[in-house]
Amino acid sequence: MKQLINNDWWPVLKPQFETANYQQLHNFLVDEYGHQQVYPEMHHIFEAFNWTPFSKVKVVILGQDPYHGPGQAHGCSFSVLPGVAVPPSLQNIYKELQADLGCPPVKHGYLRSWAEQGVLLLNSVLTVRAGQAYSHQGHGWEQLTDAAIVALSKRPTPVVFILWGRAARDKKRLIDLKRNFVVESAHPSPLSAYRGFFGSRPFSKTNQFLEMTGQAPINWQLPSTVDHL
């Protein structure tokens, strides 16, 4: 499975694959993928890392675990593949993006153009059993993704960490706040979006920090159509 990381994330994460924790996780996943329906497909597990190399990361949007419906998850937080209905949380993200920067919502949920500009779409847990949210929590993914957050936090070039919801905000403890910038609010889920997500302006705040630190801002406007995977 570790062979699925094919860029400069590998030397960053390699020590995690040499731990007893990872061996336990590996054994758990072999059993789960062998006997259960698990998302995403195995070759997509590390998609977030492959889409956004370590040296290119400017922003991290931290999710909790993958979508657990058929065909939704493909290894990147909040994103879904072309042709899949836009999930409610992502619909709310689009609403806030329009209110914040005037970007009209698109009809797909494929966030690759963000990733290619340096937005790491990272979930804390990288797999899930079909129909069972949070079912793979506590089996070892958190140690690996925490290590990724810590490594980014220590990089010379500062990073923006976007933390939506209690689980993501708990990761603030891993981040060097003197060097980096945290944008945090309620989760965009319909259950909580009106409790502080709407009106939080995460996209403009992110770009202001990037420009202040000499980095190019993110073009948050997604293409209206998607013609590549």
Curated annotation (Swiss-Prot):
Signal sequence region: none
GO BP annotations, alphabetical order: base-excision repair, AP site formation via deaminated base removal
Matching InterPro entries: UDG_fam1 (IPR002043), Ura-DNA_Glyclase_AS (IPR018085), Uracil-DNA_glycosylase-like (IPR005122), Uracil-DNA_glycosylase-like_sf (IPR036895)
Stored SMART domains: UDG (SM00986), UreE_C (SM00987)
Superkingdom: Bacteria
Subcellular locations according to the entry: Cytoplasm
Reaction it catalyzes: Hydrolyzes single-stranded DNA or mismatched double-stranded DNA and polynucleotides, releasing free uracil
Class of this enzyme: hydrolase
Record-annotated active site: D65
CDD domains the record matches: UDG-F1-like
Gene Ontology CC: cytoplasm
EC number of this enzyme: 3.2.2.27
Gene Ontology molecular function, alphabetical: uracil DNA N-glycosylase activity
Protein keywords: Cytoplasm, DNA damage, DNA repair, Hydrolase
Family designation: Belongs to the uracil-DNA glycosylase (UDG) superfamily. UNG family.
Function: Excises uracil residues from the DNA which can arise as a result of misincorporation of dUMP residues by DNA polymerase or due to deamination of cytosine.
Annotated protein name in UniProt: Uracil-DNA glycosylase
Species the sequence originates in: Limosilactobacillus fermentum (strain NBRC 3956 / LMG 18251)
